[in-house]
A protein has these predicted regions:
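N- or domain-start disorder-to-order transition segments that initiate the globular core
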Residues: 1-31
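Hydrophobic faces of well-ordered beta-strands that scaffold small-molecule active sites
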Residues: 17-23, 38-42, 77, 102-108, ...
Length: 251
C-alpha cells in the first residue's frame, strides 16, 4: 500500500471529513472508493474523456442514445450516460442517509456562467436523473443567484469555480436563504456545498511568485489555499451554516 492510499484511508476513517474523487474514469473511481471515497464529481470535460477512453464499456449505454439528438439534448444524453451509471453505483451509500455521502456531481454548461435562468432550468433536468445527483454551477453573480433558487427548490447544489473567502461567504448566505424558502414552502432542503478550489489558487500564486522572482518555497505557496479554507470554515461556523466546504483542485 503506498503512502497516498494510507493517507486517504486514515483521512476517511479517522477524521470527521469525507472525500469525493474528481474523475469519471472507472478504474480511478474503484480505487478511490476502495480507499474511503464516498462520492464523486464530474464535469463535461471529464465525462467526454471517460467516454473516449473506455468506449467498450460505455458502448451499450451510448447505443441507447437516439442518434438524431443535437445541441443541449445530445449533451444531456451523454452526461446522463455517465452520471446516471455512477448515481446507480453510489445509491447504496446514499441510502444510508449519512450527510454528504453517496452523491455524484453533474455540472451545468460552463459556457453559460452568466445566465442564471438557463442554469436553473438545466439544474432541474440534471437533478431529475437521480436523487443523489448534485448540480454544480459557478460561484459567479448569476451562478449564486441560480444556486439560491435551486436550493429553494430542494435540489442538491454545489457552487464551483470558487477561490476566495468572499465567494464562499456569498454561497453560504445563498444556501441559507434558499433552504429557508424551501422550508417555508414545505420542501425538504437538499445538500448545499461551497467548493473552494485551493489547488487552483496555489497554481495562480505559484505562477505569480515565479514571474516576480520571489523565490518562495512550495510549502509557503500551498499555505494560501489552506488559509482560505480555514477562514471560510470558521465564517460558516459563525453563521451556523450547514453548507459543506469542499476543498478541491488539490495537487
Amino acid at each position: 500500500m503506498n503512502n497516498e492510499h494510507k493517507y486517504l484511508q486514515w483521512f476517511s476513517s479517522q477524521t470527521k471529513s469525507i472525500y469525493w474523487h474528481d474523475s469519471a474514469v472507472r478504474a480511478e473511481q474503484q480505487a478511490a472508493f476502495a480507499n474511503g471515497a464516498t462520492g464523486m464529481t464530474t464535469n463535461p470535460f471529464l465525462i467526454q474523456s471517460t467516454l473516449n477512453g473506455d468506449r467498450a464499456f460505455w458502448a451499450g449505454r451510448l447505443a441507447a442514445i437516439p442518434q438524431d439528438l443535437k445541441g443541449d439534448e445530445k449533451v444531456y444524453a451523454l452526461m446522463q450516460c455517465v452520471t446516471g451509471y455512477y448515481a446507480e453505483q453510489t445509491r447504496p451509500i446514499f441510502e444510508k442517509g449519512v450527510p454528504g455521502e453517496g452523491y455524484v456531481c453533474a455540472q451545468t454548461n460552463p459556457n453559460k456562467t452568466g445566465d442564471a435562468e438557463y442554469m436553473i432550468e438545466q439544474a432541474k433536468i440534471l437533478a431529475s436523473w437521480a436523487p443523489n445527483i448534485v448540480v454544480k454551477m459557478p460561484a459567479t453573480n448569476a451562478g449564486i443567484k441560480a444556486y439560491e433558487e435551486c436550493a429553494a427548490l430542494g435540489l442538491n447544489v454545489a457552487a464551483t469555480v470558487s477561490f476566495t473567502v468572499p465567494q464562499v461567504l456569498a454561497v453560504g448566505e445563498a444556501a441559507a436563504r434558499g433552504k429557508e424558502r424551501a422550508k417555508q414552502n414545505g420542501i425538504k432542503p437538499g445538500l448545499t456545498i461551497a467548493v473552494l478550489m485551493c489547488g487552483r489558487l496555489d497554481d495562480y500564486l505559484r505562477d505569480v511568485a515565479q514571474d516576480m522572482k520571489l523565490g518562495l518555497d512550495e510549502s509557503v505557496i500551498t499555505m494560501a489555499g489552506l488559509a482560505v479554507a480555514k477562514r471560510s470554515y470558521h465564517i460558516l461556523q459563525e453563521m451556523k451554516s450547514d453548507a459543506i466546504i469542499m476543498p478541491a483542485g488539490l495537487r
